Amino acid sequence: MAGHPKERVVTDEVHQNQILRELYLKELRTQKLHTQYHVNPLRKVHRITRKPMSWHDNLEEPADARFLNLIHHAAQGPTKKYPEAQTENQEIGWDSEALVDPERRDHRMNHFRVYSDITLYKAKMWSLGEDDRHK
């Protein structure tokens, strides 16, 4: 049945010590202390490259004009690099100029915020905490 406690087996300390000793000796067999080091001739050797952004490594090198032009050309936006859009996604924002010159004084298209006495009064009331905006 599930409720009965099991009897504890008394551990033999001599037997437990013998098990721990065998475990310790097995671990010592797998460990090896390396005191002599050498290069493995079968391993591929990779050349360590210099850091491209460090200033002290690049002092003696002259600036390559062709490489600098290539970097500056790659940093430009696609509209400056190409005369036409190269992909369909570029076509969406390719012509960023307005089709119609915006006339700021034309009130038919430009609805600027106009402040009068009543709008300033109501804005002040709302900022002070009046919450009944439906009156």
Curated annotation (Swiss-Prot):
GO terms for cellular component: ciliary base; cytoplasm; cytoskeleton. Pfam families: FAM183. InterPro entries: CFAP144. This is Protein CFAP144P1. Residues 77-97 are annotated as: Disordered. It is found in: Cytoplasm, Cytoskeleton, Cilium basal body. The keyword Membrane does not apply. Disulfide bonds: none annotated.
